[in-house]
């Protein structure tokens, strides 16, 4: 399911929850749900949430710069080792370019940069003595880019961990309903989103790798896009009905 659809569903689910549980709707709750509704896709390097942390154009530029710097370094080191033999050093550098471009690709670099960003954020929080649950939360997110797409981050266990960490932060900092709306947003990604795609999600990972699916259409296909619209329409209808009923 597309990122914008996940975001929309997360926001609508939050509005519905606010109506059902008679909780005032706030911008904070909606933004929180929107962010958490796309968090599971941090395990996909080109997802909406990954692009929030690091734009693809930026990572492609960084990749070029890194490769150029390494190649220049290899060339000059080779010159020194080979007694300023320009021809031999050029051959060594050319081979190095071929190997580097094969081994260091855009996706790998994005994973590294995304993880480093979240790890650095965790370290900053640790050194300014923010409560450990914040640090653990961002360290967990730092592991997501290295996970197989739709594995741990798309499981019930991940929802439980997210709820637990947010609940501790909520209690410590007295942030009303943080765990409730964060978990709703995250869970909506799974149960109102990817569960309805053909590839499904491993709900009981890591206990079982079996993927569960209530859909028959590939993400991005006409029918899957139509299904996404239908889910959004149903949620909007549910909100209107709940409002009228109240």
How does the language model describe each region?
Residues 1-188, 192-246:
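N-terminal membrane-targeting hydrophobic helices
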């Amino acid at each position: 399911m597309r990122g914008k659809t996940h975001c929309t569903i997360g926001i609508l689910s939050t509005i519905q929850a606010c109506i059902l549980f008679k909780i005032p709707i706030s911008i904070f709750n909606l933004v929180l749900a929107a962010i958490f509704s796309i968090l599971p896709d941090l395990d996909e390097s080109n997802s909406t949430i990954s692009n929030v942390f690091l734009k693809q154009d930026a990572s492609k530029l960084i990749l070029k710069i890194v490769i150029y710097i390494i190649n220049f370094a290899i060339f000059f080191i080779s010159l020194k080792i080979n007694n300023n033999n320009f021809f031999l050093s050029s051959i060594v550098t050319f081979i190095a370019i071929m190997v580097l471009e094969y081994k260091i690709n855009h996706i790998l670099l994005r994973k590294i940069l995304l993880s480093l960003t979240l790890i650095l954020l965790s370290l900053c929080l640790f050194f300014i003595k923010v409560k450990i649950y914040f640090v653990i939360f961002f360290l967990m997110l730092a592991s997501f880019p290295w996970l197989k797409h739709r594995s741990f981050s798309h499981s019930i266990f991940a929802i439980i961990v997210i709820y637990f960490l947010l609940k501790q932060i909520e209690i410590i900092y007295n942030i009303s309903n943080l765990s409730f709306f964060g978990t709703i947003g995250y869970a909506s990604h799974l149960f109102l989103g990817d569960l309805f795609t053909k590839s499904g999600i491993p709900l009981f990972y890591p206990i079982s790798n079996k993927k569960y699916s209530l859909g028959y259409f590939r993400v991005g296909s006409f029918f899957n896009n139509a299904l996404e619209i239908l889910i959004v329409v149903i949620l909007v209808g549910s909100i209107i009905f709940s409002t009228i009923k109240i």
